[in-house]
Regions:
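Membrane-embedded alpha-helical bundles of multi-pass transporters/translocases
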Residues: 1-234
């Protein structure tokens, strides 16, 4: 019964998230228009989301949940140790990735929007906005980790509810700052990263009942860690 209830709650939040996502896109189109500012924001929004699809969505859950659930059958301590090892590898890898991309941002923009190099002001704006939004990847990937913990315990509603946060924050920013002219796109970019942080805090609040990480500087690659990354990485 609890599983059915959780699945129903998940479905409701997914529908709400999609409706809010549509409203968000409509408002962005209205207030940012279709000029260079809108183009810059869409690239800034797309780059961290492109990496998120690689690191923080289905492939991570598909690799982590079965392995973690298997460890749970062997005891809570073994499951915690496994999850903690994965968390430490994940946060280290994400920090390195975010720092490298922040430093080399113009190059990454060239990869996904090479035409921007023909307009220096557009390139500079896109670089600025993407450097603001890119930490979203760190926050949302860690949120996905804790969502996977919850999914392993048949708690699906929290992750689905968390997906609404980004849309709500961006909608509120547009409605409150719609008369801010060129500053609106800056506020929206900060809103993306702030929403990711809030989403991480929200999911962790519920996941800490089952797992709370212990940060370690020394990382050990075990057979189980290798097996996880073989499943996770393409």
């Amino acid at each position: 019964m609890n599983l059915i209830k959780s699945t129903g709650t998940f479905s409701i939040f997914v529908i709400i998230s999609r409706v809010l996502g549509y409203l968000r896109d409509v408002l962005i189109a209205i207030y940012l228009g279709s000029g260079p500012i809108a183009d810059a924001f869409f690239v800034a929004f797309r780059l961290p989301n492109t990496f998120r699809r690689l690191f923080a969505e289905g492939s991570f859950n598909a690799a982590f949940v079965p392995s973690y659930s298997s460890e749970l059958t062997r005891g809570k301590i073994k499951a915690k140790n496994f999850a903690n090892d994965i968390f430490n590898f994940l946060i280290l890898g994400l920090l390195i990735l975010v720092i490298v991309v922040e430093i080399l941002m113009p190059g990454f923009i060239f990869l996904i929007a090479p035409g921007f190099y023909e307009d220096q002001s557009k390139l500079e704006l896109t670089t600025l906005l993407t450097r603001i939004t890119f930490p979203f990847l760190l926050f949302i990937s860690l949120a996905s980790f804790f969502s996977a913990i919850l999914n392993s315990h048949n708690k699906f509603g929290v992750a689905a509810a968390a997906s609404i946060i980004l849309n709500i924050i961006l909608i509120l920013i547009i409605l409150l700052e719609k008369n801010s002219d060129d500053n609106l796109v800056i506020y929206l970019s900060y809103g993306v990263s702030i929403a990711g942080l809030i989403q991480l805090i929200f999911v962790y609040f519920f996941a800490k009942k089952y797992f709370s990480p212990d940060l370690k500087l020394r990382l050990k690659i075990t057979k189980k860690i290798k097996l996880f990354f073989n499943k996770f990485l393409p």
